[in-house]
């Protein structure tokens, strides 16, 4: 009858598949677990009861939500909540909420011009008739409206917010304490979309809207925000939110949404968006991302010819045959015409036309430019020439002062020069608007327009973004790559100074360091990059990871966007897309961990890591879920990565559980465990922190018969696991060198467990109301409860403010002790009624929430055999010893199964354990284990919130009866 003391010294090996339980020959299997729920593995080897979480609030209307972490720095973060076509923002764990003010803006829908002042300059035009239309009209013209808003004395020095809807931007906006000032909101550009802009006026404030380009922009409404939570309208319906992919640069989040089921193959109907933050973090916008200069399809997409009705402003784009559809609204078109003609309107000084390039031979032929001036005006229009380029070196060579036809004959044959028209200084302009029409047959002009409205299959209304040369048909045109007609990108990422968009098996990289520029006429290595990716069927790009190389995930393969050498930046000339894995990806956002990428395989039930292999010179796919093939059977619906205090991947499953992988490659830690709560986890989100990252779950719970969805934030480990301090010495009113953070509430009790008083730690010291010679000092509150409320109150047995847990059985830790002990397997709980519970004694500091248990079961204890293997042999575990750390005396139960369990012995070193005692360290001789003779002997452990438990090692004694 051989006997052995087994050593379970590493409890961070985690779950293993039932298919591997017979592999007792493998060391990893011996240290693994058949069940590991609500235990958190530490990279050092221990496991501890997972932390609980705090109730923060509900998502909008308790609806399912998507979440985008916003990280400006580790100390400047926010959570963006997306529900059905709505966005809210959580800052410092609270929703941005607008205060109540009586300030209003009458005629904020611009039904008439009442209340608004037209302050336009240089011929700018303002129109108000159900919306505000601003048009610069002339070169250097500016359409400007202003308004003074009265703020009553009680509303001064209280935050105001302006809700602004821009129907067609960009609009320049500022708010000041003086007319035209920007003391409250510095001048900013409002793109097409919805804005909520906050500021705090000390008195009346002044609004200024401005637009200086020669095409119209449209503002729908402006209003002072009503009291309540900030809500901003978005385009994303609930079903499409899981398809959102984003990346962030400073205060801007670039968003693609690729989950529209009716969109073109591999693409989306959702135009890319920008989520913008301004100022102190209380101003937010959701606006269109619409580059004005690309990307374009290389060849025209129809045999139709196109022409514009005017070369600038708001005009009509006409096709020679049926071509346009309503899905073209928002699309851009580029048309090329020979000749460099133009119509330039001048209505002020400091006005310069675009330059035109002159070359060829013959002053009166190839090198002749003709200017026809019309209108009512008094000014000096200077004809200027440059030999240096289109942007510098101009000198006046001729002056036009009246309506006439002027020929500019350049005699420098075969010399390239540039001309422009200008009214450069104030002295050159007196009044009126001069219209100068240029005709020059040399060269050519590429104009760009954006479709505003669909009229028919042959005409659409457009805004001219870049001037055209002629109003004649041309077959030299290109359609933009992105539109509702052609589809939009499905993923976005920032990499090597470029903003990348992916969709429809194509990759689009912006001009370097210019995220809204896709001008394919840009020269050199900074030029934009447009590449076809993948092979075989057209695939959606489900995710993009900027690692050493840009990695992409599609349904059929994983792809690396790479240059000709590892450290060479991507350019339009050296970029290639190469397959690095054929696992295929699920439509789940992947995550980055240092230089590695973590993604969900095509089945949705396996998790892989892409790690760079120096020997292969590329990334290799390695399965992380290999040892637990059944764990993810319900499907992974989202991923989040936590880096501190350990690296953990939170894989939210389709059954409401979370599979958590603790990972540390250098220490060969790969530990799967499960998190369960009394609810259904729908999302996990991580924001960076200093000592520990901030982890959030969005949990669906049924409370009092109603479905609720709560945002809950996990407590820090130091708020859940902590030492208990014993003071023993001379009578004192000041106890120093306490191991608790500043602000920690602690409770002092005597040796009988009677409460003495509560105090708050400052600089490791507490000052007592009454001196003591002996005291047990314990943090008053505990983070080991779910959906918790932590609070402070005057001494009372009643705890209120628990309406979010109405009808639920809750557990309580208050004034440094548990009110929810476990006896005979049953835990003491309290049922919330009318939002409150009543305890058997008064308390001041409390933590109340849902309880949870943490079962752990070993693999087969098939060891200590003298005649070969111990598998299928009768054996019995009869003793066990533990090494514990910061564990409550009632915090750990052990047994052969979950129905036969003992608590830790309540006598230690010959003394009875205090009922409130926490074992800071625990290293005792073995004691009896309630085992039985069986061929399959196991160890089962179980911990119960709110009792701390950290297991560093277990040493069971096993007796085996060999049968030969």
Task: Please give the residue ranges for each predicted region.
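Beta-sheet repeat architectures centered on beta-propellers
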Residues: 2-99, 237-240, 536-539, 582-585, ...
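Extracellular and organelle-lumenal recognition/adhesion modules and their flexible linkers in secreted
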Residues: 99-227, 352-369, 377-382, 387-392, ...
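Beta-sandwich interaction modules
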Residues: 192-200, 235-245, 359-362, 395-440, ...
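Edge beta-strands of jelly-roll/beta-sandwich modules across compartments, strongly enriched
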Residues: 215-222, 427-442, 947-961
């Amino acid at each position: 009858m051989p006997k052995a003391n087994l050593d379970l010294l590493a409890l961070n090996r985690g779950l293993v598949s039932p298919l591997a339980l017979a592999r007792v020959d493998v060391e990893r299997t011996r240290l693994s677990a058949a069940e590991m729920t609500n235990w958190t593995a530490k990279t050092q080897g221990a496991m501890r009861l997972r932390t609980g979480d705090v109730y923060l609030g509900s998502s909008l209307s308790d609806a399912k939500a998507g979440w985008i972490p916003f990280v400006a720095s580790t100390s400047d973060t926010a959570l963006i909540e997306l529900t059905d076509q709505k966005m809210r923002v959580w800052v410092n764990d609270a929703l941005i909420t607008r205060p109540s003010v009586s300030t209003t803006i009458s005629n904020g829908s611009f039904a008439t011009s009442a209340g608004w002042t037209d302050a336009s300059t240089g011929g700018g035009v303002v129109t108000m008739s159900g919306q505000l239309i601003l048009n610069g009209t002339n070169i250097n013209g500016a359409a400007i409206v202003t308004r003074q808003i009265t703020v009553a004395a009680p509303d001064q020095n209280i935050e105001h917010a302006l809700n602004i809807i821009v129907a067609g931007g960009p609009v320049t906006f500022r708010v000041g304490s003086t007319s035209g000032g920007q003391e409250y909101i510095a001048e900013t550009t409002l793109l097409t979309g919805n804005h909520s802009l906050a500021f705090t006026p000390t008195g009346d404030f002044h609004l200024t809207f401005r637009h200086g380009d020669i095409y119209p922009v449209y503002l729908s409404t402006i209003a002072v925000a009503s009291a309540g939570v900030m809500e901003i309208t978005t385009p994303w319906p609930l079903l499409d939110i899981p398809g959102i992919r984003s990346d962030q640069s400073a205060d801007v989040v670039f968003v693609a949404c690729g989950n529209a089921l009716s969109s073109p193959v591999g693409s989306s109907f959702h135009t890319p968006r920008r989520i913008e933050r301004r100022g102190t973090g209380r101003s937010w916008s959701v606006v269109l991302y619409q580059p004005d200069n690309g990307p374009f399809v290389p060849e025209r997409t129809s045999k139709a010819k196109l022409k514009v009705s005017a070369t600038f402003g708001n005009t009509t784009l006409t096709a020679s045959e049926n071509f346009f559809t309503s899905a073209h609204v928002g699309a851009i078109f580029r048309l090329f015409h020979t000749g460099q003609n133009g119509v330039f309107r001048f209505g002020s000084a400091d006005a310069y036309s675009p330059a035109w390039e002159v070359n060829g031979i013959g002053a009166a032929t190839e090198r002749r430019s003709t200017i026809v001036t019309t209108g009512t005006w008094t000014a000096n229009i200077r004809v200027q020439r440059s030999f240096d380029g289109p942007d510098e070196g101009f000198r006046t060579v001729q002056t036009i002062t009246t309506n006439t036809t002027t020929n500019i004959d350049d005699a420098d044959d075969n010399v390239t020069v540039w001309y422009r028209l200008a009214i450069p200084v104030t002295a050159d302009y007196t009044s009126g608007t001069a219209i100068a029409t240029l005709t020059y047959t040399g060269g050519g002009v590429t104009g760009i327009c954006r479709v505003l409205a669909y009229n028919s299959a042959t005409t659409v209304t457009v805004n001219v973004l870049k001037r055209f040369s002629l109003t004649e048909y041309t077959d030299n045109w290109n359609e933009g790559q992105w539109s509702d007609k052609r589809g939009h990108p499905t993923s976005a990422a920032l990499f090597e100074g470029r903003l990348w968009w992916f969709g429809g098996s194509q990759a689009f990289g912006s001009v370097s360091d210019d995220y809204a520029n896709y001008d394919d006429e840009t020269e050199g290595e900074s030029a934009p990059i447009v590449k076809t990716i993948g092979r075989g069927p057209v695939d959606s790009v489900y995710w993009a990871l900027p690692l050493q190389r840009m990695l992409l995930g599609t349904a059929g393969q994983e792809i690396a966007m790479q240059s000709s050498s590892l450290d060479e930046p991507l350019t339009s000339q050296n970029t290639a897309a190469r397959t690095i894995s054929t696992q295929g990806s699920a439509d789940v956002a992947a995550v980055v961990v240092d230089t590695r990428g973590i993604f969900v395989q095509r089945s949705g039930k396996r998790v892989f890591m892409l790690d760079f292999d120096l020997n292969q010179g590329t990334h290799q796919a390695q399965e992380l879920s290999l040892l637990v093939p059944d764990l993810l059977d319900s499907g992974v619906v989202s991923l989040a990565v936590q880096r501190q205090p350990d690296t953990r991947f939170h894989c939210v499953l389709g059954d409401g559980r979370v599979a958590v992988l603790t990972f540390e490659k250098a220490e060969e830690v790969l530990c799967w465990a499960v998190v369960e709560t009394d609810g259904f986890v729908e999302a996990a989100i991580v924001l960076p922190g200093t000592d520990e990252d901030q982890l959030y779950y969005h949990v669906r719970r049924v409370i009092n018969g109603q479905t609720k969805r709560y945002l809950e934030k996990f407590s820090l480990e130091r708020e859940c696991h902590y030492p208990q301090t014993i003071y023993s010495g001379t009578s004192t009113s000041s106890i120093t060198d306490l191991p608790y953070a500043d602000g920690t509430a602690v409770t002092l009790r005597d040796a009988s467990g009677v409460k003495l008083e509560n105090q708050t730690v400052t600089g490791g010291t507490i000052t007592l109301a009454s001196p003591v010679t002996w005291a047990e000092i314990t943090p008053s509150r505990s983070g080991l409860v779910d959906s918790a409320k932590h609070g402070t109150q005057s001494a009372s047995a009643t705890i209120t403010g628990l309406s979010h847990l109405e009808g639920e059985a809750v557990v309580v830790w208050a004034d440094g002790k548990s009110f929810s002990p476990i006896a005979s397997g049953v835990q003491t709980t309290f049922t919330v009624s009318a939002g409150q519970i009543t305890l058997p004694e008064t308390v001041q500091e409390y933590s109340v929430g849902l309880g949870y248990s943490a079962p752990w079961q070993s693999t087969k204890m098939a060891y200590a055999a003298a005649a070969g293997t111990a598998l299928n042999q009768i054996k019995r575990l009869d003793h066990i010893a533990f090494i514990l750390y910061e564990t409550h005396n009632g915090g750990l139960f052990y047994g052969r199964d979950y129905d036969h369990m003992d608590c830790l012995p309540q006598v230690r070193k010959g003394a009875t354990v205090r009922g409130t005692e926490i074992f800071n360290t625990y290293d005792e001789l073995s004691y009896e284990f309630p085992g039985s003779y069986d061929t399959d002997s196991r160890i089962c452990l179980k911990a119960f919130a709110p009792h701390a438990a950290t297991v560093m090692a277990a040493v069971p004694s096993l007796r085996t009866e060999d049968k030969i």
